[in-house]
Regions:
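Terminal alpha-helical segments
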Residues: 1-134
Length: 134
């Protein structure tokens, strides 16, 4: 059976700066929300930071970004399009970060402080890796 193809759209590689700018804005929002102990906002901003950072990386290096209905599909696209010694580790990290999105948005309880702080560390590490490759 052939591997599932991830839906994606083509973009001019110079457009990566738009997505990096969004990632940095979401990162700042995550930090600000964390300082105010707004854990739901901090968590969701962190997830969106990584989505935009992934878009920046894929657009710059491959001229594409995911257009799938599932954010998790970006993990497969990242593995298929980015060549780096840390890709497996960082793709796993991205998958774990993205898995938090539904918990933060749709579960009928607040995102716990402990989870938000752990997520913040993962986001910082993932964004650092992305910026190194840009």
């Amino acid at each position: 059976m052939a591997p599932k193809k991830t839906r994606h759209k083509k973009f001019s590689r110079d457009r990566y700066t738009l997505y990096l700018s969004k990632a940095m804005e979401f990162f700042e929002a995550m930090v600000d929300a964390s300082q105010k102990k707004n854990w739901n906002a901090a968590g969701l901003a962190g997830v969106h930071c990584c989505i935009s950072a992934t878009d920046a990386l894929l657009v710059k290096h491959a001229g594409v970004r995911s257009s799938s209905d599932s954010h998790q599909d970006a993990v497969g696209l990242l593995l298929a399009k980015i060549s780096d010694p840390d890709i497996s580790k960082q793709a796993k990290r991205l998958g774990e970060i993205l898995a938090q999105k539904n918990l933060i948005e749709y579960v009928d309880k607040s995102f716990p402080e402990k989870n938000a702080l752990i997520l913040k560390i993962s986001v910082e590490r993932y964004l650092g890796w992305v910026r190194k490759l840009l």
